[in-house]
């Protein structure tokens, strides 16, 4: 009997070694770029059947203080992480002779690696001379002390239920807002998402906070900002790990967030600018960063009179259709979404026991604000389907390059100017020109960027 048990132990050990060897063969280590600075592996990226978009955040959290790429790194350096197993569905079967073997499942890194930016050491971009009290993101006067901070880039959901219930908070106080298609779906759940940039104002409430997408590693480095978000697919998280930015994933930074448990998962995760900045200071990540910013001018340009801009055509999702209407009295564009209904932002104070799923408690009277912008900029760029599975509905991530050059439409002061955008690297701001190649200046104030596919047709009036 003892002999039989011993043979069983030896056999089981042998099988275990074979399984481990097979797993190692399926997951080759990534080849770091020459400028990367390796460090000891930290907590592995959690795997799940779907990203935060499909299910609420897990309550099974790692110990506070564990990190997912949250260490601030100089531009040109990043920290590769060990590969993790993939929950992505297997690749389609290989085409060819009948009976040919199916292709091996694509790993997280195999799906994500083609979209990894070539971060390197670039010469510092000279910051234009401007008064210390002029916000480089808006061109407006601001408290100089507020400008000596790291910008926050918050991922904010835009599902129809969020707008219907007036759950948006903080958008009206952002300096910049980017709106983009988040996924390519063949079902009715497609929508857009916002990346809102906060520097000169500190909203008491920001939300609802949602998951990150691969577009974020292209916009956050130019701001040297901190990305405020909640989870994402394994492929997206791996890409964030290779990117020089402050990563404030809610999963690993629970004390910076709270929950309004009266809402569904699409609207319940919230934060405040004050709390995020307290968390940055505790971690030693808050600092003044040089921002090149945009060019601004009070002088209205010559252009085609346009008072209404609407995004209603496919592939823009029906649930996210939006119109901007020029208001001559204020000199701003008012946002309507869904069409015909003002898109409202709610401003109200909040108290919370931060972290570990703590409840958000709002205090005081809600103040609703109609979202507006001094500039609406439409950027045209490629939208490429990827193999990165983003949620349990098998929606795939969209690669939207924001470097290079492309067409642009600039709307300010009730006119449209056709032009171009250009950007050499992820660390640089966009440069805007009109159709004649002359620099184009934005109107001082808030700018909303609508990022659309090449050839997308706007509805203009």
Language-model segments: what does each one mean?
Residues 2-12:
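Bacterial N-terminal signal peptides that target proteins for export
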Residues 106-178, 185-461:
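A surface/extracellular/periplasmic glyco- and lipid-processing/surface-interacting theme
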Residues 12-13, 87:
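A periodicity- and composition-biased signal for non-globular, repetitive helical segments
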Residues 23-130:
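Ser/Thr-rich, Proline-interspersed low-complexity disordered segments
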Residues 3-4, 24, 259, 361:
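Secreted/luminal cysteine- and crosslink-motif detector
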């Amino acid at each position: 009997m003892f002999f039989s048990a011993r043979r069983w132990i030896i056999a089981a050990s042998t099988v275990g070694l074979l399984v481990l060897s097979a797993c190692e063969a399926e997951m080759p280590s990534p080849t770091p770029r020459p400028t990367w600075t390796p460090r000891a592996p930290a907590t592995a990226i959690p795997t799940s059947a779907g990203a935060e978009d499909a299910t609420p955040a897990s309550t099974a959290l790692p110990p506070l203080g564990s990190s997912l790429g949250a260490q601030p790194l100089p531009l040109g350096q990043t920290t590769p992480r060990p590969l993790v197993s993939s929950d992505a569905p297997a690749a389609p079967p290989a085409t060819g002779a009948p009976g040919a073997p199916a292709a091996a499942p694509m790993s997280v890194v195999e799906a994500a690696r083609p979209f990894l930016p070539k971060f390197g050491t670039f010469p510092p971009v000279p910051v234009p001379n401007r008064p210390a009290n002029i916000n480089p993101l808006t061109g407006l006067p601001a408290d100089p002390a507020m400008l000596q901070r790291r910008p926050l880039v918050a991922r904010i959901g835009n599902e129809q239920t969020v707008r219907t219930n007036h759950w948006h908070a903080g958008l009206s106080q952002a300096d910049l807002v980017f709106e983009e298609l988040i996924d390519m779906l063949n079902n009715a759940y497609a929508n857009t998402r916002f990346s809102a940039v906060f520097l000169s104002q500190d909203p008491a409430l920001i939300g609802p906070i949602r998951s990150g997408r691969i577009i974020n590693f292209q916009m956050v480095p130019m701001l040297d900002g901190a990305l405020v978000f909640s989870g994402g697919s394994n492929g997206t998280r791996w890409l964030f790990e290779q990117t020089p930015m402050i990563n404030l994933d809610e999963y690993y930074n629970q004390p910076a967030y709270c929950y309004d448990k009266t809402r569904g998962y699409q609207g319940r995760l919230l934060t405040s600018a004050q709390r995020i900045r307290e968390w940055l200071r505790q971690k030693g990540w808050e600092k003044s960063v040089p921002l090149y910013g945009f060019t601004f001018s009070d002088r209205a340009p010559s252009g085609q009179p346009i008072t209404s801009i609407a995004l209603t055509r496919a592939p823009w999702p029906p649930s996210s259709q939006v119109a901007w209407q020029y208001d001559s009295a204020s000199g701003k564009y008012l946002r309507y979404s869904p069409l015909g209904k003002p898109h409202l932002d709610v401003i109200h104070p909040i108290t919370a026991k931060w972290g570990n799923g703590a409840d958000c408690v709002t205090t005081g009277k809600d103040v609703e604000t109609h979202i507006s912008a001094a500039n609406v900029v439409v950027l045209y760029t490629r939208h490429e389907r990827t193999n990165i599975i983003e949620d349990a509905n098998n929606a795939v991530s969209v690669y939207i390059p924001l470097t290079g050059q492309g067409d642009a439409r600039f709307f300010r002061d009730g006119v449209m100017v056709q032009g171009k955008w250009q950007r050499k690297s992820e660390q640089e701001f966009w440069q805007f020109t009109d159709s004649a190649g002359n620099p184009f200046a934005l109107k001082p104030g808030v700018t909303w960027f609508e990022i659309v596919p090449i050839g997308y047709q706007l509805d203009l009036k």
